Amino acid sequence: MHAALAGPLLAALLATARARPQPPDGGQCRPPGSQRDLNSFLWTIRRDPPAYLFGTIHVPYTRVWDFIPDNSKAAFQASTRVYFELDLTDPYTISALASCQLLPHGENLQDVLPHELYWRLKRHLDYVKLMMPSWMTPAQRGKGLYADYLFNAIAGNWERKRPVWVMLMVNSLTERDVRFRGVPVLDLYLAQQAEKMKKTTGAVEQVEEQCHPLNNGLNFSQVLFALNQTLLQQESVRAGSLQASYTTEDLIKHYNCGDLSAVIFNHDTSQLPNFINTTLPPHEQVTAQEIDSYFRQELIYKRNERMGKRVMALLRENEDKICFFAFGAGHFLGNNTVIDILRQAGLEVDHTPAGQAIHSPAPQSPAPSPEGTSTSPAPVTPAAAVPEAPSVTPTAPPEDEDPALSPHLLLPDSLSQLEEFGRQRKWHKRQSTHQRPRQFNDLWVRIEDSTTASPPPLPLQPTHSSGTAKPPFQLSDQLQQQDPPGPASSSAPTLGLLPAIATTIAVCFLLHSLGPS
């Protein structure tokens, strides 16, 4: 995912005793008067041909698609190379994400967590499973979803997961978030579209690079603190004594309406605990600050620098190609961003307002245009296949945003969708192309055939795959050295978690019905 996320867990851990008011109208925004009134998360790298940076958000694409300016969609269509944080259509990505969540050596959470904490967690998950049928919407049921399947898709095999992933899972098992299940998140949708359009796709990060900071680095007390605080918050919400401060609806509104200075972007949806209304004693505030500092460095600054360098490498490898980089919007906002890295290296990167024409020379090997979608650029105008976007408040993302703005890692919903959609593809046809984990000299690969299911309002919707693999990392040494059966690693950052059903859930009609078949 991060899902995704410069200060998510970070600022979240430090947020104490302060209930923040919720925006009144969720994801609703006023219709704009014209394209120029839309918010834009598109940046252009000035070169010949140009390259583009696009800020995504890890929420159902149908909630934001109509608010994405036509020139952003045109830039995507004009590109011949599309890169994401992770390769969302590669079976190895899915299997590695699934396995990195597992405790090593067949360990179980009951063996690792303190007795009381384990049973509190189990009681909460039992409650969620009981409530799941009432949380689901008629539309979800009409699309073939059922409660047990949905619960297993998110929380299956939870007792085998590392505490950090369980913490993220708990934060995705809320009524509001459950109601969003069934539609691919924007990142995944773009990956599916790129595959459908036969574009060359790839990634700038390896699965291990997203997993490692979560599975390693925190000591036993920090792990206990983060998981315990997460459960306390969810138990308070459940008891009615606390209202969730920021929800997916709020994040969608801020993305669509361009309120980028809002602190909500520090919390990339409710996947990350805020610990609001929790009075932390001084020693626990120190623990929170230590966790904040660690993840700020590992999940924000180091990732941005690494991603920026790999963007530059890909640009050098594809000097005559139009490249499109789709990362979490937070990677382009705040301090020490990917854009800062590129500018420091001498590249000219400009924000591209909505309504501004995209000037791109026609690609030498244009990708096939799916269902009448135009891929020819050269002043590229809004693509015919892209619906007229309803509106939103005009706001260009400022370059000097709050340093706590969070780059998105893949969130729990994002990853569970990857697995579910992948299980509906005959990915074994491509298995032979993934005999070895791809190294980073293979920064882009050709995506092959895919099946599609066209959703009503939008152009196309391809699919992706999944599989299983051995855990790439061992449990943090600090945790293994603990006397009591302590929890495995638990940070509270913004990485998403892949449901454990990688090896337990059978093929079923899609969890997310608008997704590919």
UniProtKB/Swiss-Prot annotation:
**Chain spans, region Disordered:** 354-409, 422-441, 450-492
| Entry's transmembrane regions | 495-515
Regulation affecting activity? Inhibited by 1,10-phenanthroline, a metalloprotease inhibitor which is a divalent metal chelator. Also inhibited by EDTA. Not inhibited by Bestatin, an aminopeptidase inhibitor, nor to a mixture of inhibitors for serine, cysteine, and aspartic proteases and aminopeptidases.
Coiled coil ranges (UniProt) are none
Chief location of this protein within or outside the cell: membrane
Keywords annotated in UniProt: Cell membrane, Glycoprotein, Hydrolase, Membrane, Metal-binding, Metalloprotease, Protease, Signal, Transmembrane, Transmembrane helix, Wnt signaling pathway
Q: Where in the cell is it found?
A: Cell membrane
GO CC annotation terms, alphabetical = nucleoplasm; organelle membrane; plasma membrane
> What topology does it adopt in the membrane?
Single-pass type I membrane protein
Molecular function (GO) terms for this protein are:
metal ion binding; metalloendopeptidase activity; Wnt-protein binding
- Function of the protein: Metalloprotease that acts as a negative regulator of the Wnt signaling pathway by mediating the cleavage of the 8 N-terminal residues of a subset of Wnt proteins. Following cleavage, Wnt proteins become oxidized and form large disulfide-bond oligomers, leading to their inactivation. Able to cleave WNT3A, WNT5, but not WNT11. Required for head formation.
| Extra remark beyond the main annotation | Was named TIKI in reference to large-headed humanoid in Polynesian mythology.
Q: What is this protein called?
A: Metalloprotease TIKI2
Q: Which organism is it from?
A: Homo sapiens
Organism taxonomic ancestry: Eukaryota, Metazoa, Chordata, Craniata, Vertebrata
